[in-house]
Each structure stands twice: as structure tokens, then as C-alpha cells.
């Protein structure tokens, strides 16, 4: 999957660089609770999913943060994911090095 509104970013987790803080363009489907793969929310009040790996998790924010995958978090025993409080202030997966050290429960 390509990036949405981010220029030349890769589709995989962690593939987006610093230029991915813009909003989503067309083709971003799904609501805030529907991301189960490596997707993140746009900066601001998120209303759709974006295939970039930088964006807003779990509500509104002014600074892009790195989201984690629900699947990766489950494998580390966290049980959280995008749309469930995944923001950079806390990190329950930090010691295990998963979820880009951004997962919080």
C-alpha cells in the first residue's frame, strides 16, 4: 500500500519519514476503530485511517506520533493498538522493543 498524502513514503510499518505530517488525501478508508494492520491516523481529529506510519492515535493531537500495529502489540502481550490509546507518552511495549516503543495500554 502506498502512502496517503505523504509523498514518497513506503507502505510498510516504519516506512514513513519526517514528511508525513500532512492530512490524508483520497482513498483512505475506515474509521478510527478499524485499523488492524500497520496504519495510523492523520494529524488532528482523526476520522479516517491512513496507510502512513505517522499520524494521530486515539483522538486529536497537533504533533504526529508513530502508531503501532494491533497485531504487533498483541504478540508482545500489550493488547492495545491504534485507536486504543497508542501515543508516545507511555510505552508498555518499550522493554520488548515492539510497537516502535509507542504502545501504551
UniProtKB/Swiss-Prot annotation:
**Which stretches does the entry tag as region 13 X 2 AA repeats of CG?**
4-83
Q: Does the keyword Repeat apply?
A: yes
Q: Does the keyword Zinc apply?
A: no
Task: State the source organism's domain of life.
Answer: Eukaryota
Keywords, A to Z, come to: Keratin, Repeat
Q: Which GO terms describe its cellular component?
A: intermediate filament
Q: Which family does it belong to?
A: Belongs to the KRTAP type 28 family.
Functional description taken from the UniProt entry: In the hair cortex, hair keratin intermediate filaments are embedded in an interfilamentous matrix, consisting of hair keratin-associated proteins (KRTAP), which are essential for the formation of a rigid and resistant hair shaft through their extensive disulfide bond cross-linking with abundant cysteine residues of hair keratins. The matrix proteins include the high-sulfur and high-glycine-tyrosine keratins.
Extra notes? Human have a similar number of genes as other primates despite the relative hairlessness of humans.
Instruction: Please identify the protein, giving its name as recorded.
Output: Small cysteine and glycine repeat-containing protein 6
**What organism is recorded for this protein?**
Homo sapiens
From which lineage does this chain's organism come? Eukaryota, Metazoa, Chordata, Craniata, Vertebrata
Q: Which gene encodes it?
A: SCYGR6
